[in-house]
Regions:
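RNase H-like nuclease fold core
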Residues: 1-23, 36-43, 47-51, 61-90, ...
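Intrinsically disordered, low-complexity linker/tail regions enriched in polar/charged residues
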Residues: 26-30
Length: 203
């Protein structure tokens, strides 16, 4: 049983098949498919319409590979359940991104998949995706947001009223770092966030 979770499609459930085919992997709808129903699609040869033999030859998280062979016309094909993005199965990245961006607990989400017997990524895969891909994506979007904000302020030549807030434990506690946030009080938007050592708060 497979699941493909789309964190960007809560309000886009009205795509036709043709429309969905032209979308990027993260924009496409994903569906819950039972293994028995999936294998029914590989019972007939697409070349000569004879009965074929098919089996799941590889599983990587939520992605699987199926080999279909026809003894009548010797046709063989390999089918993948999802596209690859940067050498990684798109569904696996979507699951990790959905967990992180929704603020969910990865241990609980992945445990739910196991209880449902849904093919899914491991916790170590989620951590790797988070470290090497998702954090970088967040930083990229954040920097673009900051550039757009500064450009807009310059274009309209408006004055800006800024307010700051810092959070950190008091000396003697375990926290080594704290955060400083800067807010545009007129627009109600965060302008900047900086991670600083706790000792800087008291110097």
């Amino acid at each position: 049983m497979l699941i493909f979770y789309d964190y960007n499609s809560f309000f886009s459930c009205f795509f036709t098949v043709d429309e969905n085919r032209d979308l990027k992997p993260h924009e496409q709808n994903k569906y819950l498919v039972f293994e028995s129903n999936l294998m029914e699609l590989f019972e007939i040869c697409t070349k000569c319409c004879s009965p074929t033999a098919a089996s799941i030859t590889y599983v990587n998280g939520s992605m699987l590979k199926i080999k279909q062979s026809c003894e009548h016309c010797n046709y063989t094909r390999m089918w993948f359940s999802q596209p690859y993005v940067g050498g990684k199965p798109a569904g696996n990245l979507s699951i990790s991104a959905g967990i992180l961006f929704s603020g969910s607990m990865p241990t609980k989400v992945l445990r739910m998949y196991r209880f449902m017997k849904v093919a899914c990524i491991s916790s170590s895969t989620f951590m790797n995706h988070q470290k090497y891909y998702l954090y970088s994506a967040i930083a990229h979007v954040w920097h673009d947001y900051q550039k757009d904000y500064i450009r807009d302020v310059k274009e309209v030549r408006r004055s800006v009223v800024l307010g700051g807030d810092g959070r950190a434990d008091t000396p003697g506690h375990s926290a080594k770092y704290g955060t400083n946030s800067m807010l545009d009080l007129d627009e109600g938007v965060v302008v900047d966030i900086q991670l600083v050592q706790v000792q800087h708060y008291f110097n």
